[in-house]
Amino acid sequence: MQPPLLVLSVYLLWLKYCDSAPTWKETDATDGNLKSLPEVGEADVEGEVKKALIGIKQMKIMMERREEEHAKLMKALKKCKEEKQEAQKLMNEVQERLEEEEKLCQASSIGSWDGCRPCLESNCIRFYTACQPGWSSVKSMMKQFLKKIYRFLSSQSEDVKDPPAIEQLTKEDLQVVHIENLFSQLAVDAKSLFNMSFYIFKQMQHEFDQAFQLYFMSDVDLMEPYPPALSKEITKKEELGQRWGIPNVFQLFHNFSLSVYGRVQQIIMKTLNAIEDSWEPHKELDQRGMTSEMLPEQNGEMCEEFVKNLSGCLKFRKRCQKCHNYLSEECPDVPELHIEFLEALKLVNVSNQQYDQIVQMTQYHLEDTIYLMEKMQEQFGWVSQLASHNPVTEDIFNSTKAVPKIHGGDSSKQDEIMVDSSSILPSSNFTVQNPPEEGAESSSTIYYIVAKVLQHFKGHFKTW
C-alpha cells in the first residue's frame, strides 16, 4: 500500500482497536470479530481518492476549455481596440478639416450670413411652412438648420464635443490587464493542483484498474469515460462563438453623403417658388377663398396673417435667393464636414460601447470560471494535499491513540470515540459518535465510522 493510502488507513486501524472491545485490555477477545474494518476502510479510501482524482482531471479539462474561450475573448478585445483606435483617428481627421473650414468660412462670409439670416428668420417662411399643406415638417427642419448654422458661424457658438478622454481608455486597458493577470494565475493554480494530484496517482497507480489509469493519463481532448458527479451548471458546455458574436464595427456605418443642409436648401427654393407661383400679381383670385381651401383650420389665424403680409413676403425673395447662394457656393464644405463629423463621432461611440461590452463579457467569463474552479476544488482538491506529507511508514501506527469513552463504568455504552491524531494532523484529536441503536460491532457501525473519519480527513485538507 502506498503512503497516501496509509495516511487514511491509519484512522481505520484506530477504529479497529476502539470498536473491538470495551477496554484496551480486552482487545484480544474481540479482535477477530472486526478484522473486516481495515479492509472496508481501505476500499472506501481507494474509492474516495479515485473519485477525487476523476474530479481533478475533469477540472483540468474544463480549465483548458476555459482558457481557449478566454483567448478568443482577448483576441476579440484586441481587434475591437484596433477598430476603436481607427474610428478615433478618423474622427480626429474630420474634426481638424471641419475646424479649418469653419475658420475660413467665418472669416470670409460674415456679411453673407447677415443677409441670409433675415430670410430664414422671417415670418413669411414660418407662415408659409405652417399653412401650406404637405410642409408640416419644414418648420422643425428650419429650427434645426438655424441651430446648426449658428454653431458654425456665430462667434458665440458652442464648441464641438471633445473626443473621449485618453484617461478613460487607460482605465479600460488597466481593467483588461487585471483580468488577464487574474485568469493567468487561475490557470497556474489549476495546473499546479493537477500536478500534485498526478503525483498521488503515480504513487497509487497499481491500486487502480486499467481503465481508470488509461483515462487519467489520456490526452485531455479525448472522451472522458469517468465524468465526476457535478451539477448541471458545472458540466454545461457552451461554445463561445454561439454566445458572443463579435461583428466588425466598420460594417455598421457607411455612406456619409446624406446631408440635412442639402434638404434645407431645397426647402428654401421650393418655398420661394411656391410663393411666387401662388401669388402672381396679375392673377385675380379670391385670396380668402384660396386660403380657406388650402390652409388647415387649426392654423387659420396664422394663415390669414400670411395672406395680409403677402406683398411683404415677396420682397424677401431676393434675400432668400442670396441665402441659397450662400449655402451652396460660399461654404459648401462646412455642412458636409459637419455631417461626416457627427457620423464619425457616432462610430467612435459605437466602437467604445462594443469594446465595453466585450470587456464586461470577459469579466463575467473570469468570474464564472473562478466560481466553477472553486466549487470543483472544494469538492476534490483535498486529494492533492496528500502530496505535501512525508511518506508514511509502519511506525506511524504505533504513535496514534484512540480511546473509547465509557459512561458510568458501563462498557456497553460506548457512544463516543476520541481519536488522537497529533502525529498526522495539526489538530490534536476529534470525536466520532457511534450511530444510535447500533451495536459497536455491527457492519453499519463500521461503515458509519469509516465515513466519518474520511469526512474529517477531507475537511482538514479543503484549502484554496
Swiss-Prot record:
Disulfide bridges in this chain: 105-331, 116-323, 119-320, 124-313, 131-303
Keywords tagged on the record: Coiled coil, Disulfide bond, Glycoprotein, Secreted, Signal
Predominant cellular place of this UniProt entry's protein: secreted
Residues with glycosylation annotation: 195, 255, 309, 349, 398, 429
Coiled coil: 56-109
Single Gene Ontology MF annotation: misfolded protein binding
Leader sequence residues: 1-20
A GO CC annotation given for this chain: extracellular space
Annotated localization: Secreted
Family the entry assigns: Belongs to the clusterin family.
Protein name (Swiss-Prot/TrEMBL): Clusterin-like protein 1
